[in-house]
Amino acid sequence: MEQQQQQQQQQKSVAHISKLFVCTAVDCKDEIEEKFERSYVSLQQQIAGLSDKEMHDILTQFVCKEKQHEEISIGFLYIILTDPAMAPKTYRDITLVSRDGMNVIVANLTLLVAEKYAKLTETARRQLIWVLREFVKHQVLSVENVIWNCLRQAGGGDVSHKNLYLVESLLDIFIEYRAWLETNPFLVQSSVYSFVRLIEDHANPALISLRQKEVKFTISLIRDRFHDIIPLGRDFVRLLQNVARIPEFELLWRDILYNPKSLHPTFNGIWHLLQIRTSRRFLQCRLLPEMERKLHFLASSVKFGNQKRYQDWFQDKYFATPESHSLRSDLIRFIINVIHPTNDMLCSDIIPRWAIIGWLISSCTNPIASANAKLSLFYDWLFFDPAKDNIMNIEPGILVMYHSIRNHPFVSSTLLDFLCRITKNFYVKNEDRIRLGVYNSLKLILDKQVIPNLHPLFESPKLDRELRNLIRENFREFVTPVANMPQSMYPATHTIQAPIFKKEADQRLMQGEIMDAGGGGAFVASSGTNMLVDDDNKIAIAPLESMERENEAVFSDDENLPSTSKNEENTDDDDDLPLSKVRLKEKPVPEKVELPDAIAESFEIFVTKRNSFTWEAFLKDFRTLPASALDETQLNYVISNTVLILRETLPQQNVFSESKTEEKYLAKSISYPLYGLFRFLYENEDKSKKPFQTLLSEICGRLTETGYLLLYFMKIHCKLQTRKNAQQSYQFKTTVYRQICEATDEKIGVCLVRDLDLLEKENTTIYLWLLPDIYREFKTIAINNTELLRITLRCIDAKNVRDIMYSIAQGKLTIFKQDGLLDCIRDSLEYETYEQFCLWQLIQAHDVPLKCIQDLLPELEAANHPEALSHLLLLLKNEEPTNEIIRLLLSREAKSRGDPFVTSALRFWCQRCEEKLSEIIASLLTSKYPSSSPNKRKRPSKGSSAASSTPSADHVLNHLEHYRRSCRHGTGTGLYVHDMMQRALQSAYSHSNESTKKQFSDLFALAAEDETTAVGRRGGSGRGRKQPVGKKDSSNHSASSKKNSDVVKTIYSSDENSSEEDWSKHKVTQPAKKRKKAINDSD
């Protein structure tokens, strides 16, 4: 009996639980579930069968006790969440009996949402929204806590119906009760941060109405409450970048960049936001509570090496849909800024943060999400200030690269490439500040011994050469560490490497042309750059296997360092201790130094006005200044300020003229101070003093674009001056460019190729525009220069090829000369197919005779050089066969199945000049068998230069044999019936050994017998030579020739693989034809 009662009670409990939670047979009830069930059962027992008045009276008595008050409140909440019909009446009952302003109900509802929202039934979730609306409507205290936890349950990367319902329901509450929302600044910040993040996931056309509602609400709230939005800081900017192509957000971006005061009087622009570290509570609100618990467990309880099964579970649970990839950025930002392990954990065998982040990045297969994940990893580097930022925020970035370089070099190389390019292109206007942030990060990493040194990473042989060069350009202060001298890695005066101008399309972020209107914008690394791009401009990241165990880095934390400066940032993150003792040895900008009177005034004016006129005036004074007039400190001061001003005054985009013809655009494009230096050098070619040479050397070394901008300047300057004074000729002075090369102590050829390579990468159109001038003015260097040729070939399309050929045809451009062209072609054999086809088009445009390149014929292989062979075959078609061409052609290696190139050439020549071709080949074959030594082959002497390209008798016979096989049905067989070929074949037969006779028996069978030679198995007659036939026998001779031809046709109509015995059946008994006089080679 007791067992039956227990079973009934269990069934009753399960029935009650099933109303609120989705349970399975294996689920065990936890404390929260039992608490709600117990409260509901207790309430039902107390009010069962009572009228409303009786119920209110008895409950009023019970709620006087604290425990019973909580139990009754939870019981009512249970009814509201499970019974929609009774919810309004129950809510009125709560208001009557509650004695704490519903504080207990709100607290328990907050706990329920945070811990059990995923297990709530659909009815319970809908009733949750209903009760929240009632709470907000009646302004119940602390309801914002429930709202905030509901916002957390609105997960990113989730477009399921369940999640979309929650998102839209919360949005409707915010819109309807906007006035209440604005009374809570933290909830305003959380809702804006959350919805800007969620809008990114709602790009599907099916969600357009929801997305438009979200955009309208979010933009309105941002603009109306921008003073509450400012504390969201730099991560809010990161989220805004992902939605920047939506028209409403595009307008917001323009106000942030160009009209910040219109948003709020205290707002100073984008850098104002980027300097504020985002509070970890906002980063936390973008993770589901359950996901946060799993992540904490992974980072605090799982041993390194045992993490794979947990990662697989996490992957299947949260990354199962295409939309879920965007969640990786949220996870990485949370790990970096919220999960800060203690020193004990760092020294333990628990999986480190960098390994989790490495797994998140390497397992991402979506290119946009992958780029955003990398940005999330390095985001704090870009704005790092040692005085107030935590080293724990930059530590994972360096460790994931450092530990991956050995076993996963692809991960390290892609991250390094991303870091280099984002440093230049994230915010070009403030590149110096961004670069300083990255410099501070790397310096603190070394100071705190996060890793011993950067050399194993930056100089790893597993990085390709281009990436190592990029690292040297961006982090030259850290590239060459010296053993036992760590301070040598940090120069006394910090210099910031100048940016290399990227193509204009790569410089749209945070500039005049910032973004396109549209949806679904994303941060993508393109051609190695980081920017807002269209959806079709992506980089695919291949997934890698999970990170394997490697040696961990042990480094000291900053928690024991005393704090000596107040953290001015208003944040509730009390464990982010400022590192005030970590300082740069010197400030980036040197302090003012007194200069000699000769230059002090002009330099001060230049520093103040920063224009070309004041710059040239200073150069005029500085050029003649002797070395003794300046000490090292003064010279460094001049150089540092000069380089900084020259770089800052150059435009960040559109550095070249918009038009190649209009004077105003041309003049404007060379009006900047750097061009003033070029103008000064152009007009003053006399040798200058050492300080000026040092200044010039430093400018060229730090501003890598100096060389190609000088070439551009000379083109424009000569063009403009010639228009002003047509009677005077203005030269494209190569001497000025030589000065630049001498200043960098490099050969002019090396400098020219490097500068033109940079120019092509910056702007292909300008590169091709300058090309004729380069080949004209630097002809000794440029003509037949394979490196310059490769730069040109890699960037041209069909229209460019056409324009270059126009210039060649008009005599404006000469790329090749005959001497040395052969070497150019040999180097080009490794180029891409399209590049080789373009090359041959240009060679053809130069009217290069075949004799200049015919030496290539024996070298080319059919399998490896199809492009060159195709064009050479076309050239051969336009030529008559000569002794030299045939010699080279037949020198080609004859494969077992023949050489189609040789066969093709012989075939089309046979159609035009069969007899001449036959005589040339016959003469070549005959020359291999001297009459003085009938049984030995003639071998070329060791000193003969033509030995390597002179065909042997076997070569010639091989090609003739393969040609014979190609002649089906008697076509083309006339090559063998001419007198000289007949004699040559007979001579070859008589001088060949038995194996050769057997190998070429079919070929030798084509030769008619004469009186002195027997071919094949035919016996000789032993008779002397006949007298030539007279005119009266001419008809007989013609008949004989015809019969001979018929025999040849009969032979070729048979199977080409016939045996020697088969050939012996064809007896050729005609007398030999009248011999023609041998043709001289000169013919």
UniProtKB/Swiss-Prot annotation:
This is Integrator complex subunit 3 homolog. Component of the integrator complex, a multiprotein complex that terminates RNA polymerase II (Pol II) transcription in the promoter-proximal region of genes. The integrator complex provides a quality checkpoint during transcription elongation by driving premature transcription termination of transcripts that are unfavorably configured for transcriptional elongation: the complex terminates transcription by (1) catalyzing dephosphorylation of the C-terminal domain (CTD) of Pol II subunit Polr2A/Rbp1 and Spt5, and (2) degrading the exiting nascent RNA transcript via endonuclease activity. Transmembrane segments: none annotated. Residues 551-579, 929-953, 1014-1083 are annotated as: Disordered. The modification Phosphoserine is found at S1053, S1054, S1058, S1059. Pfam families: HEAT_Ints3_C (PF24566), Ints3_N (PF10189). Keywords: Cytoplasm, Nucleus, Phosphoprotein. InterPro entries: HEAT_Ints3_C, INTS3, INTS3_N. Residues 1066-1077 have a biased composition (Basic residues). Belongs to the Integrator subunit 3 family. It comes from the Eukaryota. It comes from Drosophila grimshawi. Residues 942-953 have a biased composition (Low complexity). It is found in: Nucleus; Cytoplasm. Belongs to the multiprotein complex Integrator, at least composed of IntS1, IntS2, IntS3, IntS4, omd/IntS5, IntS6, defl/IntS7, IntS8, IntS9, IntS10, IntS11, IntS12, asun/IntS13, IntS14 and IntS15. The core complex associates with protein phosphatase 2A subunits mts/PP2A and Pp2A-29B, to form the Integrator-PP2A (INTAC) complex. One of its GO terms (cellular component) is cytoplasm.
